[in-house]
């Protein structure tokens, strides 16, 4: 990794071409270009319209349940201090995005995109989903606003996330199992892009993470930034100062970007992103694009990708369906190269330990995705002084993972 000179601000991207340094952009078929430009224009207009912001805030409060609490994880903090050297052991806070309606951070972004789709007069919404959380959030808001909803989901994920598949169908969505490729998130996204090209007139593609062609990475980040904005306000109210560090898990990276972005220019705040190391980065069975990948183009943007020797996209593996994406949002790739954010990775085994510990100590069953972040909190917190304030984004609840984790632990439900 080469450290480039630090810019005056880490928050000015992307440029007018949708780039963060050499990352991002819009590498799409000619047929999609008019749609992308329309979307960019509509988003710029919505951002400048006070009524759009008012709608976001109103539905955020009364439908999603914002603000989400910033919660002091007291027993976890004490547990880690007990085995840390004297005077060590950070004070740990959870940003509780799992308490949102639909059970994760995904709904923040979907609300913004669905309100935008309505402004653009698009009655049909398509989405891709891995763990099913983005699919559920999209189906939920389509039901709320009476829009047709089609969700593409890899056939493997359909099997391991059965509760969410049923939820989507209950909400009136059509769930399309994708049988091509690895039959996971990457393939679901490919199918959704194909659908969009075919149905340009009436369809809005609601992307679930900070990936895809510009303006999606910036737009999704903006809609998720409510997480970091609230965290700043809440921490100032609780502790009278900013946190010392932030930790979040990363698949495509929208929950992390939402927490990180408002803090990027607060240079004293350490920022950690946690990718999925699967069976270990050396094993080849992982989803850690920054740790084990290299720059390339996928799904309309240039970013770090998992590739084989021939430059073909490699299979990603993670215990968590929401993290097994072979790429990462382009802004994360840029922040990695600039050295502003430190990217770590957590194995399946470490994640399961954190999943158990959080459940037992805090009475919160986390999703497997934020359990990756928690596993690194367990490592980082004991190395920090006791006055260090650490915030982890608890981006989703674990209900969807209970059948899978029960099976791993040898329990039959």
UniProtKB/Swiss-Prot annotation:
GO molecular function ontology, one term from the record: tryptophan synthase activity
Reaction(s) catalysed by this chain's protein: (1S,2R)-1-C-(indol-3-yl)glycerol 3-phosphate + L-serine = D-glyceraldehyde 3-phosphate + L-tryptophan + H2O
Pathway info: Amino-acid biosynthesis; L-tryptophan biosynthesis; L-tryptophan from chorismate: step 5/5
One matching Pfam family: PALP
Keywords assigned by UniProt, alphabetized: Amino-acid biosynthesis, Aromatic amino acid biosynthesis, Lyase, Pyridoxal phosphate, Tryptophan biosynthesis
Disulfides per UniProt: none
Cellular component terms (Gene Ontology): cytoplasm
Function summary: The beta subunit is responsible for the synthesis of L-tryptophan from indole and L-serine.
Protein name as catalogued: Tryptophan synthase beta chain
